[in-house]
């Protein structure tokens, strides 16, 4: 079940990425903080799953956001480390699933990631 959710989420990321960067006339431009947070979410998903397709797609998305972002490279490294801390948290599910997507979404919306992003955005 978790793999299906991850694949569904990864496919959504691909669709968003292709719509944003796929040669269309309209391209999405994010703020530096949004690029970092998008990177953090993608990186968390890549670190959380073992499925080759999910890991490859999420890693490609993370790398794309890092390349397009303008914050110091250290911001992206720190975000990845912080994401791994969220993945290590114990989430209980009634079905016994690891709830990786839930952890990554909670990470994306966390105060910790917001603080990290603002710290590096204020250095610019």
Q: Over which residues does each language-model region extend?
A:
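N-terminal secretory signal peptides
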Residues: 20-62
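Compact alpha-helical subdomains of small soluble proteins
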Residues: 54, 58-124
């Amino acid at each position: 079940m978790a793999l299906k959710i991850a694949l569904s989420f990864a496919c959504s990321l691909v669709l968003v990425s292709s719509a944003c960067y796929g040669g269309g006339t309209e391209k999405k431009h994010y703020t530096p903080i949004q690029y970092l947070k998008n990177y953090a979410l993608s990186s968390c998903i890549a670190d959380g799953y073992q499925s080759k397709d999910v890991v490859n797609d999420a890693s490609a998305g993370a790398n794309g956001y890092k390349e397009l972002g303008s914050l110091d490279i250290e911001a992206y490294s720190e975000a990845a480390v912080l994401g791994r801390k969220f993945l290590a948290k114990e989430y209980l599910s009634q079905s016994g699933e690891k709830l990786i997507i839930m952890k990554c979404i909670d990470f994306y919306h966390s105060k910790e990631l917001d603080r990290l992003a603002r710290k590096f955005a204020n250095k610019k």
